[in-house]
Protein backbone atom coordinates (compact mmCIF):
# COMPACT_ATOMS: atom_id res chain seq x y z
CA UNK A 1 0.00 0.00 0.00
CA UNK A 2 1.18 3.47 -0.75
CA UNK A 3 0.13 6.47 1.29
CA UNK A 4 1.40 9.90 0.25
CA UNK A 5 1.20 12.54 2.99
CA UNK A 6 1.65 16.21 2.07
CA UNK A 7 1.68 18.80 4.86
CA UNK A 8 1.00 22.25 3.38
CA UNK A 9 0.66 24.12 6.66
CA UNK A 10 3.04 24.97 9.47
CA UNK A 11 0.77 26.19 12.28
CA UNK A 12 0.04 22.73 13.70
CA UNK A 13 2.92 20.24 14.02
CA UNK A 14 2.10 16.91 12.41
CA UNK A 15 4.15 13.72 12.44
CA UNK A 16 3.75 12.60 8.84
CA UNK A 17 5.30 9.16 9.42
CA UNK A 18 2.91 8.51 12.26
CA UNK A 19 -0.03 9.77 10.19
CA UNK A 20 1.02 7.45 7.35
CA UNK A 21 0.88 4.52 9.80
CA UNK A 22 -2.62 5.61 10.84
CA UNK A 23 -3.69 5.72 7.18
CA UNK A 24 -2.16 2.31 6.47
CA UNK A 25 -3.98 0.83 9.47
CA UNK A 26 -7.27 2.32 8.28
CA UNK A 27 -6.79 0.96 4.76
CA UNK A 28 -5.91 -2.48 6.10
CA UNK A 29 -8.98 -2.53 8.35
CA UNK A 30 -11.17 -1.60 5.40
CA UNK A 31 -9.75 -4.36 3.23
CA UNK A 32 -7.64 -2.19 0.93
CA UNK A 33 -4.10 -3.35 1.74
CA UNK A 34 -2.77 -2.81 -1.81
CA UNK A 35 -4.38 0.56 -2.45
CA UNK A 36 -2.96 4.05 -2.85
CA UNK A 37 -4.18 7.08 -0.93
CA UNK A 38 -3.14 10.72 -0.99
CA UNK A 39 -3.54 12.79 2.19
CA UNK A 40 -3.09 16.56 2.16
CA UNK A 41 -2.99 18.57 5.39
CA UNK A 42 -3.70 22.24 4.77
CA UNK A 43 -5.07 25.25 6.59
CA UNK A 44 -8.47 26.89 6.38
CA UNK A 45 -7.49 29.01 3.37
CA UNK A 46 -6.39 25.98 1.37
CA UNK A 47 -9.43 23.86 2.14
CA UNK A 48 -11.75 26.82 1.57
CA UNK A 49 -10.29 27.18 -1.91
CA UNK A 50 -10.87 23.49 -2.66
CA UNK A 51 -14.37 23.61 -1.18
CA UNK A 52 -15.24 26.66 -3.30
CA UNK A 53 -13.64 25.51 -6.55
CA UNK A 54 -14.84 21.90 -6.53
CA UNK A 55 -17.93 21.81 -4.33
CA UNK A 56 -19.30 25.35 -4.73
CA UNK A 57 -19.15 26.13 -0.99
CA UNK A 58 -17.11 29.25 -0.18
CA UNK A 59 -16.13 28.34 3.37
CA UNK A 60 -13.60 26.18 5.17
CA UNK A 61 -14.57 22.72 6.33
CA UNK A 62 -12.79 19.97 8.25
CA UNK A 63 -12.28 17.30 5.57
CA UNK A 64 -12.95 16.84 1.85
CA UNK A 65 -12.55 13.56 -0.01
CA UNK A 66 -12.27 12.86 -3.71
CA UNK A 67 -12.71 9.23 -4.72
CA UNK A 68 -10.87 8.17 -7.85
CA UNK A 69 -13.26 5.24 -8.31
CA UNK A 70 -16.12 7.50 -9.38
CA UNK A 71 -17.01 8.77 -12.83
CA UNK A 72 -16.38 7.45 -16.32
CA UNK A 73 -12.83 6.34 -15.64
CA UNK A 74 -13.35 5.04 -12.12
CA UNK A 75 -12.32 1.51 -13.00
CA UNK A 76 -9.12 2.56 -14.78
CA UNK A 77 -6.94 1.85 -11.74
CA UNK A 78 -9.02 0.52 -8.83
CA UNK A 79 -6.02 0.45 -6.48
CA UNK A 80 -5.84 4.27 -6.51
CA UNK A 81 -8.50 5.24 -3.98
CA UNK A 82 -8.29 9.03 -4.03
CA UNK A 83 -7.46 12.11 -2.00
CA UNK A 84 -8.31 13.16 1.54
CA UNK A 85 -7.79 16.86 2.29
CA UNK A 86 -7.90 17.94 5.94
CA UNK A 87 -7.81 21.43 7.42
CA UNK A 88 -5.51 21.36 10.43
CA UNK A 89 -6.94 24.74 11.51
CA UNK A 90 -10.50 23.40 11.62
CA UNK A 91 -9.35 20.15 13.23
CA UNK A 92 -7.61 22.15 15.98
CA UNK A 93 -10.71 24.27 16.64
CA UNK A 94 -12.95 21.21 16.73
CA UNK A 95 -10.56 19.41 19.07
CA UNK A 96 -10.50 22.37 21.44
CA UNK A 97 -14.30 22.67 21.39
CA UNK A 98 -14.67 18.93 22.11
CA UNK A 99 -11.93 18.89 24.76
CA UNK A 100 -9.90 16.27 22.92
CA UNK A 101 -6.36 16.13 21.59
CA UNK A 102 -5.64 17.66 18.18
CA UNK A 103 -3.99 14.40 17.04
CA UNK A 104 -7.11 12.43 17.93
CA UNK A 105 -9.32 14.76 15.88
CA UNK A 106 -6.89 14.72 12.95
CA UNK A 107 -6.89 10.90 12.90
CA UNK A 108 -10.68 10.79 13.10
CA UNK A 109 -10.97 13.15 10.13
CA UNK A 110 -8.55 10.98 8.15
CA UNK A 111 -10.69 7.95 8.98
CA UNK A 112 -13.90 9.81 8.09
CA UNK A 113 -12.54 10.98 4.74
CA UNK A 114 -11.18 7.54 3.90
CA UNK A 115 -14.55 5.96 4.65
CA UNK A 116 -16.15 8.37 2.16
CA UNK A 117 -13.62 7.38 -0.50
CA UNK A 118 -14.36 3.70 0.06
CA UNK A 119 -18.11 4.11 -0.40
CA UNK A 120 -19.50 5.04 3.01
CA UNK A 121 -21.88 7.99 3.11
CA UNK A 122 -23.75 9.75 5.91
CA UNK A 123 -25.11 12.68 3.92
CA UNK A 124 -27.05 11.36 0.93
CA UNK A 125 -27.82 7.71 1.56
CA UNK A 126 -30.24 7.87 4.45
CA UNK A 127 -30.20 7.18 8.14
CA UNK A 128 -29.35 3.48 7.93
CA UNK A 129 -26.20 4.19 5.91
CA UNK A 130 -25.24 7.00 8.30
CA UNK A 131 -25.50 4.55 11.21
CA UNK A 132 -23.44 1.99 9.28
CA UNK A 133 -20.73 4.59 8.69
CA UNK A 134 -20.73 5.71 12.32
CA UNK A 135 -20.41 2.09 13.48
CA UNK A 136 -17.44 1.56 11.15
CA UNK A 137 -15.86 4.79 12.46
CA UNK A 138 -16.19 3.56 16.05
CA UNK A 139 -14.79 0.14 15.15
CA UNK A 140 -11.72 1.41 13.31
CA UNK A 141 -11.06 4.29 15.72
CA UNK A 142 -11.00 1.76 18.57
CA UNK A 143 -8.49 -0.27 16.55
CA UNK A 144 -6.31 2.85 16.20
CA UNK A 145 -6.58 3.56 19.93
CA UNK A 146 -5.80 -0.03 20.90
CA UNK A 147 -2.79 0.04 18.58
CA UNK A 148 -1.42 3.15 20.29
CA UNK A 149 -1.79 5.26 17.16
CA UNK A 150 -4.25 7.74 18.68
Swiss-Prot record:
Pfam families: YbeY
Alphabetic keyword roster: Cytoplasm, Endonuclease, Hydrolase, Metal-binding, Nuclease, Ribosome biogenesis, rRNA processing, Zinc
Enzyme superclass (EC): hydrolase
Residues annotated as binding Zn(2+): 112, 116, 122
Cofactor: how and how many bound: Binds 1 zinc ion.
GO CC list: cytoplasm
UniProt GO molecular function: metalloendopeptidase activity; RNA endonuclease activity; zinc ion binding
InterPro entries: MetalPrtase_cat_dom_sf_prd, YbeY
Cofactor(s) the protein needs: Zn(2+)
The enzyme's E.C. designation: 3.1.-.-
Function: Single strand-specific metallo-endoribonuclease involved in late-stage 70S ribosome quality control and in maturation of the 3' terminus of the 16S rRNA.
Protein name: Endoribonuclease YbeY
Natural source organism: Geobacter sulfurreducens (strain ATCC 51573 / DSM 12127 / PCA)
